[in-house]
């Protein structure tokens, strides 16, 4: 049986590093599509030679995206931003990219598209971040029937900012808890 190929969009980030390590241990061949691939060479050290391919991808170039995805069995979208910049807008990153990836999956022989969203994604949210995440889910699901949406809240791991912050706060006599009515569904990488 041939190794399955998994293309990971945004695979050079915090979640991607752990995901790539686990997938290559299960004999997947990983194509990692990321900005500034020349800075992500360390990812190749996580597996045997040839198991990881890095592709430098401009998120505004969907023909490059098609090239990265076309021979895959599974595509995972990890691309996301927490705040907008002059060049990166929520709508483009969270909605247009998942839509384009899902369309390419439907035109190709892709078995599954896994789209990582966010726990509070909602069309009625006051947050542009949450609205754009919801739009991305809808567009991915509309364009490829084998789309799976994952909605994590906080992602925890040895290098994360969240648990390390709480570790530092633990020396205080009191730890403030804000927003106790919010959903909290952490995932460990």
Where are each of the predicted segments found?
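Conserved glycine-rich Rossmann-like NAD(P)H-binding loop of the short-chain dehydrogenase/reductase
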Residues: 28-38
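Flexible, glycine-rich beta-alpha linker
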Residues: 127, 148-168, 183-185
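A conserved pocket-lining segment of Rossmann-fold NAD(P)-dependent short-chain dehydrogenase/reductase
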Residues: 168-189
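Conserved Rossmann-fold NAD(P)-dependent oxidoreductase catalytic core, especially the SDR/UDP-sugar
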Residues: 29, 81-82, 90-143, 147-154
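N-terminal Rossmann NAD(P)H-binding glycine-rich loop of SDR-like oxidoreductase domains
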Residues: 4-28
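NAD(P)H-binding glycine-rich loop region in Rossmannoid oxidoreductase-like domains
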Residues: 38-39, 47-100, 104-107, 119-123
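Structural motif
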Residues: 5, 73-74, 112
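Short beta-strand/turn micro-motifs composed of small residues
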Residues: 10, 34, 117
